[in-house]
Amino acid sequence: LSALLNTSILLRSGVTVTWAHHALMENNFDQCLQGLLFTVLLGLYFSFLQGLEYMEASFTIADSIYGSTFFLATGFHGLHVLIGTIFLMICILRHLSATFSQHHFGFEAAAWYWH
């Protein structure tokens, strides 16, 4: 169930970051901010749930090849999500300081990284 929920969260975050990107291209800065905020919240929620999943796991990284593979793969993906969340938080700060243009490369790079 947890894997399905995490997948759903990440798919929704892809929708919200795309919403933010399209809003930015249309100079709709309020919707861009909303999309960014939703995406960051979903990224943080995903990270929280992944941490819970690690704490509740009945195996460790040292138990077997399955444990090693599981923690390595999900750990790298979790790190990717955390870095992407930080990128998007920086975009929110830049957005609030009114330094965004319709095609702000920093935002576009963060959105590419997120996908």
Swiss-Prot record:
The keyword Mitochondrion applies. GO terms for cellular component: mitochondrial inner membrane. Component of the cytochrome c oxidase, the last enzyme in the mitochondrial electron transport chain which drives oxidative phosphorylation. The respiratory chain contains 3 multisubunit complexes succinate dehydrogenase (complex II, CII), ubiquinol-cytochrome c oxidoreductase (cytochrome b-c1 complex, complex III, CIII) and cytochrome c oxidase (complex IV, CIV), that cooperate to transfer electrons derived from NADH and succinate to molecular oxygen, creating an electrochemical gradient over the inner membrane that drives transmembrane transport and the ATP synthase. The keyword Ion transport does not apply. Disulfide bonds: none annotated. Its EC number is 7.1.1.9. Belongs to the cytochrome c oxidase subunit 3 family. It comes from Artemia salina (Brine shrimp). Component of the cytochrome c oxidase (complex IV, CIV), a multisubunit enzyme composed of a catalytic core of 3 subunits and several supernumerary subunits. The complex exists as a monomer or a dimer and forms supercomplexes (SCs) in the inner mitochondrial membrane with ubiquinol-cytochrome c oxidoreductase (cytochrome b-c1 complex, complex III, CIII). The chain crosses the membrane at residues 32-52, 70-90. This is Cytochrome c oxidase subunit 3.
